UniProtKB/Swiss-Prot annotation:
Biological processes, Gene Ontology terms: regulation of translational fidelity; tRNA threonylcarbamoyladenosine modification
Reaction(s) this enzyme catalyzes, per UniProt: L-threonine + hydrogencarbonate + ATP = L-threonylcarbamoyladenylate + diphosphate + H2O
Protein name: Threonylcarbamoyl-AMP synthase
PANTHER family: SUA5 (PTHR17490), THREONYLCARBAMOYL-AMP SYNTHASE (PTHR17490:SF18)
Function of the molecule: Required for the formation of a threonylcarbamoyl group on adenosine at position 37 (t(6)A37) in tRNAs that read codons beginning with adenine. Catalyzes the conversion of L-threonine, HCO(3)(-)/CO(2) and ATP to give threonylcarbamoyl-AMP (TC-AMP) as the acyladenylate intermediate, with the release of diphosphate.
Domain YrdC-like intervals: 7-189
MF terms in GO: ATP binding; double-stranded RNA binding; L-threonylcarbamoyladenylate synthase; tRNA binding
Catalytic EC class: transferase
Annotated Gene Ontology cellular component terms: cytoplasm
Assigned keywords, A-Z: ATP-binding, Cytoplasm, Nucleotide-binding, Nucleotidyltransferase, Transferase, tRNA processing
Protein family: Belongs to the SUA5 family. TsaC subfamily.
EC number(s) per entry: 2.7.7.87
Keyword ATP-binding found: yes
Length: 189
């Protein structure tokens, strides 16, 4: 019989992240699956749960831009591009930045870039601040299925065996907009 997790506190979720677990938490629009971006085993578990190819790359969500320095190489962006990006943060906007050469392929996928977001949603901010770094963030669903907007939908698609922050999603109608940091081109609406 698998263990059934109950509602975890931020501290409890941080402990689970440090143990290499995949967690479920609310985002601005849907429930997310998250894990430690520096733990390849955790990433592989997350990808297996979602039935998602590593080649697609993953999003990192953070409490502030400083938490993302380790992963992005913003030398390729000018002050106007950075100003445009920073005017959308914190908020539900994801930007695809050039990745540092040290950023692992399990985050970038087949690309030389990494998708990042600085959230203003308090549960995510508290979690990232307590954890001390960003989280991998992807919708809590099997690839090809609708993202889960309720805990019941998470359980129905993925089962019960996850540490969960059972707090409501913010309620935005769509997942974050994704744009290319250099060109400004919309990648996902």
């Amino acid at each position: 019989m698998s263990k059934v997790y109950t509602n975890f506190t931020v501290k409890g979720l941080t402990e689970q992240l440090n143990k290499g677990k995949v967690i479920v938490y609310p985002t601005e629009s849907v429930f997310g699956l998250g894990c430690n971006p520096d733990n390849e085993n955790a990433i592989n578990t997350l990808l297996k749960i979602k039935c998602r190819s590593w080649k697609k790359g993953l999003i990192l969500v953070a409490a502030n831009y400083t938490q993302l320095f380790k992963y992005v190489d913003d030398r390729y962006l000018n002050s106007l591009q950075l100003s445009r990006i920073f005017s959308t943060w914190p908020g539900p906007f994801t930007w695809v930045f050039p990745a540092r050469s040290s950023t692992p392929m399990w985050l970038t996928g087949k690309f030389s870039s990494v998708a990042i977001r600085v959230s203003n949603f308090e549960p995510i901010r508290r979690l990232c601040l307590t954890f001390g770094k960003p989280l991998v963030s992807t919708s809590a669903n099997v690839s090809g299925y609708l993202p889960a907007r309720t805990i019941h939908a998470v359980y129905k698609q993925l089962g019960y065996d996850f540490p969960i922050m059972n707090t409501n999603v913010l309620g935005l109608p769509n997942p974050s907009i994704i744009r290319d940091a250099i060109t400004g081109k919309i990648i996902r609406k």
